[in-house]
């Protein structure tokens, strides 16, 4: 009986760890990160510049975030 309870507990723990690591991997895969400020490197296809900035790719792949007002 103790072996069955231990196995159930172990299974639950493995499931929790696997679920947590898959969610973290999903965040990394989706490219979640902080936004990029002025003159920071960006990706034109991902819109990762902060609000008020746009990604300028005059010399790809060296794209940088530029101010919308300037």
From Swiss-Prot:
It is found in: Secreted. It comes from Agelena orientalis (Funnel-web spider). Disulfide bonds join 35-50, 42-55, 49-65, 57-63. Pfam families: Toxin_7. PROSITE patterns: MU_AGATOXIN (PS60015). Expressed by the venom gland. The modification Asparagine amide is found at residue 69. Insecticidal neurotoxin that modulates the insect Nav channel (DmNaV1/tipE (para/tipE)) in a unique manner, with both the activation and inactivation processes being affected. The voltage dependence of activation is shifted toward more hyperpolarized potentials (analogous to site 4 toxins) and a non-inactivating persistent sodium current is induced (site 3-like action). Interestingly, both effects take place in a voltage-dependent manner, producing a bell-shaped curve between -80 and 0 mV. GO terms for molecular function: ion channel inhibitor activity; sodium channel regulator activity; toxin activity. The presence of a 'disulfide through disulfide knot' structurally defines this protein as a knottin. Keywords: Amidation, Disulfide bond, Ion channel impairing toxin, Knottin, Neurotoxin, Secreted, Signal, Toxin, Voltage-gated sodium channel impairing toxin. Belongs to the neurotoxin 07 (Beta/delta-agtx) family. 04 (aga-5) subfamily. Residues 1-20 form the signal peptide. GO terms for cellular component: extracellular region. Negative results: does not affect mammalian sodium channels (Nav). Its main location: secreted. Transmembrane segments: none annotated. This is Mu-agatoxin-Ao1b. Residues 21-33 form a propeptide. The keyword Ubl conjugation does not apply.
